[in-house]
Amino acid sequence: MERIYQKYTNENTEIFTYRYFDDTKYHLTNNQENKTLILNESSGYLFEIPTINFEFDYSLSSLRCKYFFDNSVLTTSFENKNPYTDKKEKGWEIYLKEWLIPYLSNDEFLKNNQIEKIIENNHEHDFLNKYERYSFYLHIKEMPENYYPFYCISIIRNKNNYKNFYLFVFKSKTNQIDTFEKICKSFKEIQKRGKALNVQVEYQPIADENWNDETKKYYAKLSNQKSIDWGIFTKSLVSKQDDAFDYISNFYKNEGDFYDKNMEHNFELLPTYMHISWAGKFNYFPKELANEYAKGDGFNKKKVLHFTFQYTASNNTSMVGYTPVFDVLRGKYDEYFRLLAKDLKEYHHPILFRLNNEMNTDWTSYAGIITLLDPDIFIASWKRLYEIFQQEQVDNCIWIFNPIAITTPYSNWGEYLNYYPKGMVHMLGLTAYERGNMKKYHSFAMMYKKLYQKNTPYFVKFPHIISEFGAGCGGEAVYDYEQHKYLFLPVCRNLDKQVNFVNKMFDEIKKYPDYVKNIKAAIWFSANDYANVNNKDYIMNYFCLDEKVAPTISAFKKGFKKVGKKSKK
């Protein structure tokens, strides 16, 4: 770095060094010119910000770095996760259009969410002589004063490198395009030394002091138990206002205890999902059915309600359409949230409350790829609901933060730790699926050991819950990405592998290794995924535990006995 020092330093320069093991960064402040050069040695780049008065956050340095100044936040990241590098330029184009800019560049999406272009998108083929740069300048309309409505986003890539690039996301309370342009034009790659590292800390779960006695006792029991509570998701509960109420009510009346009977196990959890709305109609808390089929408190032999709530108005299907996330920040759902809060509080019994799961993906309406490549929007929208619950004195919700095991888009900026709403979480949710369509079949141990390692040390103090998972037995329509078409295969062809998965899973649970010790509850997702091919629906992922997979149901029955769970009487 000595030569860089010589070029950028003079008698007015002060040097600050940040060092965390092999992670080194330098701040060269020029008091006379009121600017600071940021040398990110461990990630191999530098740039300049037009101030000497700023704060920074390097706690997740391997993923992103943040700088706070002049009513703005600059987030920078070195990106190196493009999986299509064997295709060179074509591979870069696939990654760019599929996993970086599909919504930033989509006029329909912007219009549907009241986001306007400040100026037109810009693609510079010869930026600073050796780079390619994609830039977007956006304004989120009608945002409250305490948020940042102006976004400038640039993707900078050396034209000869199809894997590595740099992402700059600059948000501000006023239009600061000129500032952003100066920052980007000061960018330069430098020799990389050391390694960017996250600060290795153990996040702390803090029990809500406002919880009622029932919830406090349940959380303490769940956190300290050495066994796993179980649930199986089949169909979501609905409110009495819902058109499907009679159908769902009859289903639970006639088939609600199917798994309890056939697996000879008293299931401890009742999982259900609810979206903000569907087809333009609000969804409401299913208090009638929850009171009839749940009401568990961890001690009374009834099922504890596991309630997943998602900011979506389309069941996460119309991705270029409307997402409620921006309106959540605008406060347009505050009244609805207060009604939800009152309903949940009135229910009284403990609720495992999972908000906006699988945010680190490209298929949810609140994913970072949709929220302008800025995970902070997810955190802000989480905080909005959390604070309303606090104001309404909700005293029975145990909040679950539940990313998916493998982040997609493959990226650093979109990794799950960037979404963590610190201080507003009581449990860590886990989700890793084996879809069961390929020759290679991942075991429970393979998936959840890896996930345990990924979550260590950050979440070792948290009780963990597998809020949804499954192992498929083989769907009938499987997409082949090499041939770019669906293959039609025998359904349930991998049933023997599914049975083996369940058998080995209970073997692991009985052994009680470190990666299992924090898992306090688990929910099998007993519903199939479908693909529409030529206007016909085919099962794509077969997770449903029905009569076709009787050997798997039998394996669960044997497994519960193996680990000593009480049988249905």
PLM region descriptions:
Residues W382-W413, K461-G475, I519-A527:
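Aromatic-lined carbohydrate-recognition surfaces of secreted/lumenal glycan-active proteins
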Residues I52-K159, F165:
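Conserved polar/disulfide-associated segments of primarily extracytoplasmic proteins
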Residues W278-I398, P490-R493:
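Substrate-binding cleft of extracellular glycoside hydrolase catalytic domains
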Residues N283-Q310, G423-M427, Y433-Y479:
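Glycoside hydrolase catalytic-domain groove-lining segments
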